[in-house]
Amino acid sequence: KVVVLLGTNMDIPVVDRRGRINMERVRLVHGNGGRFSHELTERFILKYFTNDLLAPLHDGAQFPVTAGRMAFSTDSYVVQPAFFPGGNIGKLAVCGTVNDLAMNGAVPQYLSCGLILEEGLAFEELDEILRTMAEMATAANIQIVTGDTKVVKKGEVDKIYINTAGIGMIPDGIDIGPHRVKAGMDIILSGAIGDHSIAVMGQRFGLDLSDSLKTDCAPLNKMVHAVLDKVGSQVALLRDPTRGGLGTVLKEIADQSQVGIKVEETAIPVHDEVQSVCDILGYDPLYLANEGKVVLVVEPAVTDQVLQVLHGFEEGKEAVLIGKTLDKNIGKVGLQTAIGGVRLVDLLGEDQVPRIC
């Protein structure tokens, strides 16, 4: 036999005598909807994603809807590298959408998972990503109930991209949004900023960073709802400072709620390892992405109670009061610096660290 390869993107699967494909790496044939697509689903996806709503493998999930309000959110994840200290793209994909639902005051219930896989992706890596997604879904008490998988030619994506969309129910009495924010409220931050960006950047560029520096990526829904259960009606706004970081979120709050904001630079926690990298490379921690932090705008009367609840969770043990909303300087954020000056915080024109989520 003579085999002629007509180009580098030819999909030449390795098949054994029983007709089973070589399962070490993803091939284009895994995305054609045929037998190998089914084998991929059965051997890897259903290995970790199993529940009654997903089991029928229908074109979508069918689930009961209770009375009340729903929150719906979606996000796509293209982080490079796909694996980084403390997590991977799968952890990010579940926690990111779970946290977006939580920022709406919703209890996360259902999640979709769309996978775009690069030809040649090692199945060992895919397996680890899916396993992590299942672990995070369990931790957040959310079910992955529907999904889709596509395979594209090598070089068209970077290993794996993931889209997740989530649905959650908003409890009665909870009203979270920019419309609730008014002057005189307290601004609380649940912990130190910048860990995620620096952990990803360190992995990407091979920096010699401390082993203790890991992504802060975590599902925040249980912590958030512990706060809402305690003082829900007194919480005006919840935001997670992901892309663009704390500085961007504060500026957006000022613009959307038409208030001024003043925050204390010395009150904002930044871990020493993160600050050191920022000092060396010229990064501003205010604009570094976080994947396990929440900004809360609350009535001053409940600030101490909120901090007490947050301190009871690992994700909130470093929570602090960082500032207040004002009835002047509308749409502006003033950062009271350590040396006594005031610096205006605005939106960045360009990313400091690209592709961190």
Where are these regions (language model features)?
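Helix-biased detector of long, well-ordered alpha-helical tracts
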Residues: 7-357
